[in-house]
Amino acid sequence: MRSYNLIAPAKINLYLEIISDRPDGYHELAMILQSIELADKINVQSLSTDTIRVNCNHPQVPTDRSNLAYRAAALMAAKFPEALAQYGGVEITINKQIPVAAGLAGGSTNAAAVLMGIDLLWNLGLTKPELEELGATLGSDIPFCVAGGTVIATGRGEKLSPLPSLDHIYVLAKYRSLEVSTAWAYKTYRQEFGNTYLKDTENLAARAAAVHSEAIVKAILNKDTGEIAQKLHNDLERVVLPAYPQVLQLRELFATQPGVLGTMMSGSGPTVFALVESEAQAQAVKLQMRAAIPDEDLELFVTRTITHGIQVASSI
């Protein structure tokens, strides 16, 4: 049986602005997304029957249709029935390294890897834009997870404009047992700040375009790490931090550590990241955070930016 091993990187948000509601129920967003080294390992293997199977080493990850990776395989089977008949179904094995429900796009990057893996298994020859378009029907972060790198994302997150790559080091912190519902975060933001949403279509388009002129984008273009750190922004912090004191605690503690240039919550949380000066400083910050919060429930990671999305590690 043919098999592909793929690397599925996590992402963080360097910028997240909520602009308005959309008719499809999503939000109109302006974001800057960044791929990081922290990644899951995905194996996609052909089966002799036309079934889909999902295995995962993490007990909290479902293996049925509620899993985005399963739905990605089901989408490919529905879109390409002749290939399914010719090559058979797929078995997907997920080796989780990315924390679950962490605001790091773990589920989305798994789905992106499955789309790419099945494309290879079935010799479909799909382009990256075609894979991104398929992914957008499943989830807003999936197109970015296919593309990777440093990207401006608008619409609901599916419209991508690449930026020059960054060479940054981050420390990530998250409590294992703490989860923040993305749906809750956006719903609460709408309830509390919906009166600030733009209404006019022309204004929406202008605001989405204006993100290209934001100070953080200029800092990225200039590779000014200090300025990038100062311009980190996430609207969802306005509702998540007051409701989740543990997330606020991590953010405030990161801000006091020597060598931390900037800190912010990623996505809807609960992961908080700190941009630091060097690998040595990152390891020192990790130790300082562990000493300040000697709680086994706290996960800490040192990672760095990467320039790509899903990659093939090997094939059999």
List the predicted regions and their residue ranges.
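ATP-binding N-lobe of GHMP and related small-molecule kinases
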Residues: 1-102, 120, 124-129, 166, ...
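Residue-level signal for inorganic ion chemistry
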Residues: 14, 42-44, 69, 107, ...
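Conserved beta-strand termini and adjacent loop/short-helix elements that scaffold enzyme active sites
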Residues: 57, 95, 147, 303-305
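Alpha/beta catalytic cores of group-transfer enzymes, especially the acyltransferase/condensing modules
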Residues: 126-180
